[in-house]
Design a protein with these regions (language model features):
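Conserved serine DD-peptidase/penicillin-binding transpeptidase domain
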Residues: 2-180
Length: 180
């Protein structure tokens, strides 16, 4: 038996401001194979909105749009008491001594997910930097797999499949009271 998921652009998915995560619970608690239909890089859903300034790519107010936003499409930095916490940490696994980058300002290159400090001091307790999911379209899937510690499979053609498909949207609306 297989559980199929279709990303539909839910901005709350694994976002720290939204503790209620029914799809995450579904994936973690299923004993079925999980298949996610990936975002196609060439679809009509652009990663930037009309009128967006290209050079705002690294600003926290302008994360890229995507079919499968995860963590709000930003890396979250929390710092205080001499410690720095990064979520998702996947991008920074090579850092062995976080104290060397504590209270530093972070940014990234335009294309790809090469994050670096610009050397400027940043004492804000919380800040975020958008990550690139457009030029790395499978990145949300890898982040999800890394976060949940579950094996995810990537599907590529749902038209031939006859099993039940669970859309993220359907799962969320079943668990939310949307009455006005």
């Amino acid at each position: 038996d297989t559980l199929f998921l279709t990303p539909l652009g839910d901005p709350s998915f694994l976002h720290p401001d939204f503790p209620f995560q029914p799809v995450v619970e579904l994936i973690k608690n299923t004993n079925k194979q999980v298949v996610i239909h990936p975002t196609k890089a060439n679809d009509q859903f652009g990663h930037m909105g009309n009128g967006w300034a290209w050079n705002d790519y690294g600003e926290d107010y302008q994360p890229e749009r995507s079919r499968m936003p995860i963590y709000g499409n930003v890396v979250h930095f929390y710092q205080g008491n001499g410690k720095l916490f990064i979520k998702p940490f996947t991008f920074f696994k090579d850092i062995t001594d976080i104290s060397t980058v504590y209270q530093k300002n972070w940014t990234r290159k335009l294309v790809g997910n090469q994050f670096y400090t610009d050397g400027q001091k940043n004492t804000a307790p919380y800040f975020q930097v958008p990550f690139d999911s457009y030029f790395e379209p499978n990145l949300p899937l890898y982040l999800l797999q890394d976060t949940l510690k579950v094996k995810l499979n990537i599907g590529d053609n749902f038209s031939r499949l006859k099993q039940h498909i669970v859309n993220l949207k359907d799962k969320l609306t079943k668990n939310l009271d949307v009455s006005l």
